């Protein structure tokens, strides 16, 4: 008899940076992947050519979230994991409509994972004890707060709390954890002065790159016991 095909891992926001690195990591392991993307970056074509199922999604509305969930339900009978990586980062700038800033942050970081976890729950269940995972990507600012990104920090804190609620709801079939990164990698346009200032905020004084996230995700996926926990990736920044 042939080997059973693994269930796919769903990655939201998989078209660039950490989401893209995770998608390629799993593809290289012959692990099927479903990726959501908002903007069609050239990297999406590479994922499609490698066999990934890429679905364009608009998470700015609940209707858009549910339309994406419907597409996933049509695509697969089960999921190995959901990695909630889709994110936005908006500051409270002078003149910015504050209610809109808060609504946007809550929509992408709270409404979207909340609705998807419920809509796709049946795809995660039925595969055995601790056989499925949900991983929320939160942020270092969940514990510290942020004076320049108040709505962002609040929405990520809500997602962090939701990790524990879904862990209680879905155990023991599904493990639910969160990863709280600070600086992982720089943007191409970041200048040398900014990079040095950012590096000095942590004890380790380095931007570790995507592999640090990938290694932690692999650990969480292979664990049969860890659930309802948040895992900081901050290089000791909390001790500065």
Swiss-Prot record:
* Highest taxon of the lineage: Bacteria
Keyword NADP set for record: yes
EC number(s): the record gives 1.5.1.50, 1.5.1.3
PROSITE patterns in the record: ADH_SHORT (PS00061)
The Gene Ontology biological process terms listed for this entry are: one-carbon metabolic process
Keyword check for tRNA-binding: no
Pfam families attached here? adh_short_C2
Q: Please state the span of the N-terminal signal peptide per the UniProt entry.
A: none
Query: What protein family is recorded?
Result: Belongs to the short-chain dehydrogenases/reductases (SDR) family. FolM subfamily.
Task performed by this protein: Catalyzes the reduction of dihydromonapterin to tetrahydromonapterin. Also has lower activity with dihydrofolate.
Protein name (database record) = Dihydromonapterin reductase
* Record organism: Shigella flexneri
Q: Which gene encodes it?
A: folM
């Amino acid at each position: 008899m042939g080997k059973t095909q693994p269930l796919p891992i769903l990655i939201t926001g998989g078209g660039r940076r950490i989401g893209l690195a995770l998608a390629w990591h799993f593809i290289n392991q012959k692990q099927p992947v479903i990726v959501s993307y908002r903007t069609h970056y050239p990297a999406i074509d590479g994922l499609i050519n490698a066999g990934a199922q890429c679905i364009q999604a608009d998470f700015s509305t609940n209707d858009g979230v549910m339309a994406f969930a419907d597409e996933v339900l049509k695509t697969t009978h089960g999921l190995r994991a959901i990695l909630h990586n889709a994110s936005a980062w908006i500051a409270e700038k002078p003149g910015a409509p504050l209610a809109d800033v808060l609504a946007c942050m809550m929509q992408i970081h709270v409404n979207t994972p909340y609705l998807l976890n419920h809509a796709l729950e049946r795809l995660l269940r039925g595969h055995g004890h601790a056989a499925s995972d949900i991983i929320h990507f939160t942020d270092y600012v969940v514990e510290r707060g942020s004076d320049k990104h108040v709505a962002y920090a609040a929405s990520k804190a809500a997602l962090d709390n939701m990790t524990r609620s879904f862990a209680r709801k879905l155990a023991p079939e599904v493990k639910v954890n969160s990863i709280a990164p600070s600086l992982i990698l720089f943007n191409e346009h970041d200048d040398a002065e900014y990079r040095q200032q950012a590096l000095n905020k942590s004890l380790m004084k380095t931007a570790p790159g995507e592999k640090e996230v990938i290694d932690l995700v692999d650990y969480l996926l292979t664990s049969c016991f860890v659930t309802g926990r948040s895992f900081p990736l901050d290089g000791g920044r909390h001790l500065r």
